[in-house]
Amino acid sequence: MDISKLNSLVELYFKKTEEVEGKRPFLKWLKPDKRTYNWEDVTEKIYKLTAKIKSLIKQGDRCLILSENRPYWLMTDIAIMNAGGISVPIFTTYSANDYEYILNDCKPSLISVSYTHLTLPTRSY
């Protein structure tokens, strides 16, 4: 694959899916259950997330991802870009002031949070 002819990470991902066998392992999550996701599983989840995200945002909207390092982070990131959004990843280790600054600066249309125990400051942005 000549990646110099590709325009985005999304395009690279979907080109790669054409080259690999769908059942081939792609992502492994070591916590909590050491689950392995194959290319087919991941692509299906990305398409489903893309459809949902497209129904919630407009082209160019910023979408925040608050998540640990896990397979769904990658799936969400690709789905946001595939839906025409701009991914704004933030770490779970940030302080409340960091979150507030980022939220005020980027004004996301969508916030994806991996677990309900992860919280952001509660106010309208």
Regions found by a protein language model. Name each.
Residues 26-70, 74, 78, 95-100, ...:
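Conserved AMP-binding/adenylate-forming core of the ANL superfamily
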Residues 116-122:
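Conserved small/polar residues in nucleotide/adenosyl-binding loops
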Residues 84:
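Structured binding elements
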Residues 4-26:
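A short N-terminal helical cap/helix-turn-helix that marks the beginning
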Residues 90-92:
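Short beta->alpha connector loops at strand-helix junctions that form conserved
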Residues 67, 113-115:
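Structural motif
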